[in-house]
Every structure is written in structure tokens, then in C-alpha cells.
Amino acid sequence: MSNTNKSEPNHSCKVVYASRVAETFVEQLKQHVNLFEFAPKLVGFLSNSDPAARMYADWTNKTCTEIGFQYELREVPKDDLEDAIVEANNDPSVNGIMIYFPVFNDGQDQYLQQVVSPDKDVEGLCHKYVMNMYHNIRHLDPEKTKKSILPCTPLAIVKILEYLGVYNKIINYGNRLYGKTITIVNRSEIVGRPLAALLANDGAKVYSVDIHNVQCFTRGAGIRSKKHDVADTNFKLEDVAPISDVIICGVPSANYKFPSNLVRDGAVCICFSSEKNFDAASLKEHAGIYVPSIGKVTIAMLLRNLIRLTSYQLNKPVDI
């Protein structure tokens, strides 16, 4: 007599929400904002009609109010944005500046990133901070009292990976992703490329995927190099995803879905797009951990950068 009972799959995928990860950082921010005799002021510039940008601005305002920062949203026509940024650069009452991208959705957006003063660039997108990140330079001064500012969205993903235990705390700081393979589906200059650099500089082998090709970011065999190198490969997504411990996706299209069958059993999957890049139901058959969004952690990192920059403006750097 045959046994008709079917065993249930015992695989379990844990869903981790950004709000839970952000809690610890919010408490740190509340403690550090009290170190100042005033509430640091963040100005956000909105020059597009993107609903996701509007939602991000609303979240930023809500979080600033809860913690004790000042926040002002300035809605400015695209053609007036550069002058508005320069005005904020020169306003001593403004401690931090951010722009809700995209604005022109072309190379002019990269130019606008450079218009923001490095002293107030909470997004960490100006040339000085980007160069430091790519060259793995972690401080702004020889005395190493001022940490360089990292791009807030890539930094948020790093902090999520730390929270999830992907970073190995036993290994020396700066090498804690050694032995990890990570695939990133996005190579934008704002998130995907800097994220690949950050993770590779921490010791990971990173496959960066876009519509053109797959590149490999690595510090070499045995992480011997001080900073990462980038090499073109002949690989495709289906070659690198199944060998990855972590898959990070940020495709800005409602029509894109990452193929769940390419996810290695037990892998960590993170979506940083405003669209749902993963099909949750099929993904949970493979992934060990799924982080469906990162927005609240990104805002926490934005405000972390604001505290650092405010302390630098006062020449009283704080370590946060």
C-alpha cells in the first residue's frame, strides 16, 4: 500500500522589515541630536512629480520631527534648482542638503550632485566623498577625527547586512565580507556602482549586473589589494546569481521581476527599488531572508550623515 502523505517543505524564509532595522539607529540619533544647542536643519529639494520621491520626502519629514531635527521641503522648478542649491549652500542656518532624484534624468543630475557643498552633502554624492569611497579612504583628516561621508542608500544596505549577520565580526574591520559572494542588479552612479565598491572594499566578491554586462568588483585573491578593482566578465545573471550568498535588486520598473529560480537556497535577498523586484511567494521557496524595502534605514543614514556634518561645521566632530 503506497503512502499518500506528502511531506511539507521545511524551508522557512524570514521577512525582515526596514522599520525593525532602523530602530537602533533612531535611538542613536535621538541621543546625538541632543549634543547640539540647536536642532540641525535639513533642506530637501523636490523638482519632479515622482510619487516615490514625494513619499520619501514625507518619511524624511516625519522622522526628522520625531527625532528633533528641522526639515524643510523646497519645491523648485528644474531650471531654478541650481540657484536654489547655491543659496542653501550659503545659508548658515542650513546644515544639510539633499535632492530628490531624478531631476533631469541625465548627466545634468550628476552635475547637480556637485553643486551641493561637501560641507552639507548628507547624501554623500559629491566628488570628494565618492572619490574617498572608491579609493577606500575612510577619513577626511590626517588625525582621523572626521569620517568621510558615505552615500546614504548604499550605506543603508551595508547596515542591513550587518544587522542580518552577513558581516563576520570576528574578521578584522574592513575585511568582514571576505568569502561572501554578492550579486547586485543595478549599476547606477547613485546606488548600484557605489554599493558594489563598498561591499568589495569590505572583502566581498561582487557581481554587478546591468542590461549591458556583468562586472566583477573584488580586492583580489586573499583581499590583498587596499581597494577594489573592476573587471568585465562574460558571465550572465544566470551564472552568478545561483552562487551568491546575497542578491540585491534595484530595478526601477514595475515590469521587472528577478527570477526566483536563480536564488540559492538560504540566500539573503534585498530590494531597494520603489518597485517590487521580487515575487515574494516564489522567492520564499528559496531565500533564507527577504528584505522587501530599505527606505526607513536610508533615512536613518541620511540623518546620521547630517549629525556628522553638523558636528564638522562646529569643528566638534562626533563619532556616530
UniProtKB/Swiss-Prot annotation:
Pathway assignment: One-carbon metabolism; tetrahydrofolate interconversion
CDD domains: NAD_bind_m-THF_DH
Domain of life: Eukaryota
Binding annotation for NAD(+): R187, S188, D210, I211
EC number of this enzyme: 1.5.1.15
BP terms from Gene Ontology: folic acid biosynthetic process; purine nucleotide biosynthetic process; tetrahydrofolate interconversion
Subcellular location: Cytoplasm; Nucleus
SUPFAM superfamilies (UniProt xref): Aminoacid dehydrogenase-like, N-terminal domain, NAD(P)-binding Rossmann-fold domains
GO CC terms in record: cytosol; nucleus
GO MF term set: methylenetetrahydrofolate dehydrogenase (NAD+) activity; methylenetetrahydrofolate dehydrogenase (NADP+) activity
Entries under InterPro entries matching the protein: Aminoacid_DH-like_N_sf (IPR046346), m-THF_DH_NAD-bd (IPR035812), NAD(P)-bd_dom_sf (IPR036291), THF_DH/CycHdrlase (IPR000672), THF_DH/CycHdrlase_cat_dom (IPR020630), THF_DH/CycHdrlase_NAD-bd_dom (IPR020631)
Active site: residue positions: C152
PANTHER family in the record: C-1-TETRAHYDROFOLATE SYNTHASE, CYTOPLASMIC-RELATED (PTHR48099), METHYLENETETRAHYDROFOLATE DEHYDROGENASE [NAD(+)] (PTHR48099:SF3)
Stated role: Catalyzes oxidation of cytoplasmic one-carbon units for purine biosynthesis.
Subunit structure, interactors included: Homodimer.
Family: Belongs to the tetrahydrofolate dehydrogenase/cyclohydrolase family.
The protein's name: Methylenetetrahydrofolate dehydrogenase [NAD(+)]
Organism: Schizosaccharomyces pombe (strain 972 / ATCC 24843)
Gene encoding the protein: mtd1
